[in-house]
Regions:
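Hydrophobic alpha-helical segments
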Residues: 1-191
Length: 191
């Protein structure tokens, strides 16, 4: 049960972002820029960064939401599963393994990211901007993870919620839906 009164049809982060829209808006804007804006990293790669950080922070809601989004973007579920199990053997490029490692370490603590780890990423072809955005995505999702779990937000009643949420994130991004979310009160599967 959440520590404060939130809309029951909006589990996880959406309920928090709707609770205080004036703080939710800049968080959504930053997320939209980082995960859907122009980048040399694909949307799936950026969602993988969010997944690995959320998994490392043991945030079930965020891990499940972003793994489902990766799965939808890639059309398969093996990659997100393998990344959560062991980055070093995941079916991604060496550059992506290096960036995922940076993200995972940032999620645990920024000072764990060493010059050696950054140099390895650069040797695998990572640009300064990709490294910058990786660290910022990891820091942002650490905020999300602590926000969701620190407020004890509810998990959805139905696991299919995450497939609907993934579809919304893939097709509409992270911006607030123009009509809001009241329409979700009428659905049995609450996204």
């Amino acid at each position: 049960m959440p520590h404060i009164t939130l809309e029951s049809h909006l589990p996880g982060i959406t309920g928090l972002l709707e609770y205080r829209k004036e703080t939710g808006a800049p968080i959504r804007d930053l997320t939209q820029i980082l995960l859907r804006g122009p980048s040399t990293l694909t949307e799936a790669e950026r969602e993988l960064l969010a997944t690995v950080v959320s998994h490392g922070n043991q945030c079930k809601f965020c891990t499940t939401a972003h793994a489902a989004t990766v799965d939808l973007l890639l059309g398969e579920s093996e990659t997100s599963l393998k990344v959560k199990q062991d980055i070093s053997t995941a079916p991604v490029s060496e550059k992506m393994k290096a960036l995922l490692t940076i993200a995972a370490l940032t999620g645990k603590g920024g000072r764990l990211v060493t010059t050696e780890i950054i140099e390895k990423a650069k040797a695998e072809g990572a640009t300064d901007l990709e490294i910058h955005d990786t660290v910022l995505i990891a820091a942002l999702f650490s905020l999300y993870n602590r926000y969701v779990d620190g407020m004890a937000t509810a998990m959805p009643d139905n696991e299919s919620y995450f497939n609907i949420l993934a579809d919304r994130l893939v097709n509409h991004g992270y911006s607030r839906l123009p009509q809001g979310y009241d329409h979700l009160k009428k659905q049995n599967t609450k996204p």
